[in-house]
Amino acid sequence: FIKVKNPDVIFNALHGGIGENGTIQGLFEVLNIPYTHSGVLSSAIAMDKFISKKIFKTFGLPVIEDQLLNAEDELNGIPIKPPFVIKPNNGGSSVGIRFIRHIEQIEELNALYGHKDREHLLEKYIPGRELTVAVLNGRPLTVTDIVTEDWYSYDAKYENGGSKHVIPANIPKDIFELCLSYAVKAHQSLGCRGVTRSDFRWNEEKGKEGLYILELNTQPGMTKTSLVPEQAKYVGLDLQHICLELIKDASCNK
């Protein structure tokens, strides 16, 4: 289809899976057709939460204590004690995430996650607020505070009324500026281009020491409930402007 249409540029609006992990980006590279968003390597690394956190750490970004669980690992002997969060290492959109509050839930988790054919990442739970920052062509837009009844699940992300987005986030100026700075550094550390969105967890009681980067998304959602269009609108950019910027930045071999 792509060869028949022979487009000048491909706007990659895919989300998750092969559309986000470097696979489709690799196809565009083989076809030598410029495409939007991040390239093969950046996309693949960002999709691997464990590896991307290692890179963030080398660039001085604070990350949460974690442990990578392989298929044969059992949860009983892990050093990180509840409360913690466990999620697919290469997943997205909060699919498959479990929040474990009590040790009694471990056996249930062993049945769910033990001997599976994919890796999972276990992270110490950090109480506090969920913050996020979009970066467009290297510049941060603003900080959004994501308010939910419990935690930012799949339903909270995509269902109308599932979460409340406070723009700009009502947080201290130093934390606000730190979020912007961290988001740009994360974008640069993975060699990303186009638009990305970095998610943070902030424990208010600990101030600057309580701010952690969770992950970076190279294919952030662009729906009416999505965070990037909301942030862009707040800073005076409409969806058309974002799309034009991404198309102008489209390229191969980056």
Placement of each model-derived feature along the sequence:
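C-terminal active-site "lid" helix and adjoining low-complexity regulatory extension at the edge
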Residues: 206-254
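A glycine- and small-aliphatic-rich helix-loop capping segment at beta-alpha/alpha-beta transitions
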Residues: 26-35, 102-107, 234-235
